[in-house]
């Protein structure tokens, strides 16, 4: 013990500080033991003895004033160290067990330090005017100036450990078998008393061991927990954190564990930035994708309206992309549209040929209109014109439908059917006008030839003239009569009675003659029209439909004469109107 003190007293400049620290050690030991015992008594008051009482038995009564002063100093120091009690209370039991083996030497060491305190004061040469109160004040300053972090820099841990080991060997030889369940704080204070011969850095090293031991253990445990929670590709969510909220509160402070929802002051707002964590869970249905796209469109539209209100013009593509949030909306919108298109394509592939059914039915129903209207034979131009535009599948379907439907011959030709063939009739009329080129008023011939002696070839152009003067409606009505009449002209032209007055010399007739011809022509027209109407009514009663071109062959003469009389009647009306105009002029 004497050699240890001599090692610390080689430098005379630290003599007063050494004496002050020696005076402080028993009292600080008593105070720390009292504090630790109070902490332990709060947890288990029955199983632990009063450590403060054991120290007071060994302490001499002459040091009571100094103990009171130093107790106040330690209490002030304990105020400056409010968090150390928390760390010491959390110290694991395994550390208490590991240090219990040294406790029997520590109790005897306390008694030895008290008995040798006077000897320290004499050898150090303490001045007479320094009282215990001054020593306590110096001790208080020393304690207040101790650093809390990196206290091991003053003295190496190896020297402190060797000094403590030598002291334990000397004291263990004196007393054996004494067991005192002192806490870890007693050992730290005892180390201060043992190393009191050294200057203040030795005192700092003792407190560093007491402070850093539980603090290092706590930091190691906390860092391992935080490493398990926050590190890695897949951070671990707190059990108190809702999985559905997709919260990332554990990333806000990497040095602290996630707090429960009840301790949080606010809820994290929903925004598009937080939606990025759920990109892996894209909506998988068409409805969800459509809603997502509509919401993005709504956001972009609101941005455009706000931009237009502020700058008085609509934003361009560059204005939209310059805003990071709008750029993200646009990218999400393009991605959502692409996913929606792929999803629809996938569903259509799964359904197979189901979407092709309705168009095929429509194509099959449309060509069946001529069949239902009773024109299976006369609808020859329709399949030829529509067959070029429809696919082979439609033709096959049309044939199948025609085979399934029963034949209907009593259907009527409607105006809608005539409008379908109207383009063909218009083309026929144009070609006919180009080829015929008729003249309304033929040249006047001076010879007075009879109608019988006049060649029939001269009458052919006049016969073809009325067709060009017919209106569109009449031409459509009687255009089907032209071809059969033309076909019958070479064979039956001799049997047809020529008119009494030819159309070539009608312009030479006077007004009374024209009026007589007008009355006769109207009478003939009524007669022929009546005959043709009776034929059509009888045919309709028999077949249930109006006669077509091939059905008019038995009445071809009447149809030809009726057509010629209509043309003559029109010419007479024109000539009479001309003479009336000339008379008025």
UniProtKB/Swiss-Prot annotation:
Q: Which domain of life is it from?
A: Eukaryota
Does Membrane appear among the keywords? no
Where on the chain is Phosphoserine found, per UniProt? 131, 238, 385-386
Compositional bias of kind Basic and acidic residues: 27-45, 99-112
Q: Where is the composition biased (Polar residues)?
A: 262-275
Location of region: Disordered? 26-45, 83-138, 171-216, 250-282, 349-391, 441-477
Q: Which UniProt keywords apply?
A: Phosphoprotein
**Family per similarity comment:** Belongs to the FAM13 family.
- Protein name, per record: Protein FAM13C
Species source reads Homo sapiens
